[in-house]
Amino acid sequence: MKLLEDYRVQDSSLFAEIAGASSMLKRLNQEPQWKVAIASGGWRDSAILKLKIAGIDADDFPNAFADDGPSREEILQWAISKAERFYRQNRFARIVSIGDGLWDVRTARNLEFPFLGIGVGDAERKLRCAGATHVIKDFSEYENLIFYLTEAKVLQAEPHRSGKRR
């Protein structure tokens, strides 16, 4: 943890908030039809530090981290289970996964959840190549986010590849 904090002091752009993320999470959680949970493939302590630096208090939302499961699918399922208890829901009518990495695309596909990507430039291109149909640049336009959360679709299965490498 000390190393992460030292790197952050040296480069203030590390772990910077994706524009609008903190206010979006709070606002979205006030919507009756949407509830927020945080799932991260990072270890709890480092993920909480990164969220804190980005202005997000992980304790405000149900959450799960790498400490909670060996796979990203299990981490996400654990976050959902915590959210069901936290929000007193037997099950959610719709779950949309939001992510910025290829592992997020794979996890959403494996769990058959609609997916909304977040990224610009090369990151956006990689998400789209991996199958993301909707990718936003950041969380600064709330109405845009709501539209894409509503429109997000379950990702198609990856095409089967032969065992040959080219």
Question: Which residues are covered by each model-predicted region?
Answer:
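Membrane-embedded alpha-helical bundles of multi-pass transporters/translocases
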Residues: 1-4
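Short, acidic loop-to-helix structural element flanking the phosphoryl-transfer center
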Residues: 6-38, 44, 48
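Short beta->alpha linker loops
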Residues: 16-20, 42-43, 67, 100, ...
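Substrate-recognition "cap/lid" segment bordering the active-site pocket of phosphatases
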Residues: 37, 42-96, 102-111
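Short acidic-hydrophobic, aromatic-tinged amphipathic segments that line or gate anion-handling sites
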Residues: 64, 134-141
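Acidic, Mg2+-coordinating phosphoryl-transfer loop and its flanking beta/alpha structural elements
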Residues: 97-134
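Short amphipathic alpha-helix with an adjacent loop that forms part of the alpha/beta core around
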Residues: 142-155
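Cationic, low-complexity basic patches in intrinsically disordered or flexible, solvent-exposed regions
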Residues: 159, 165
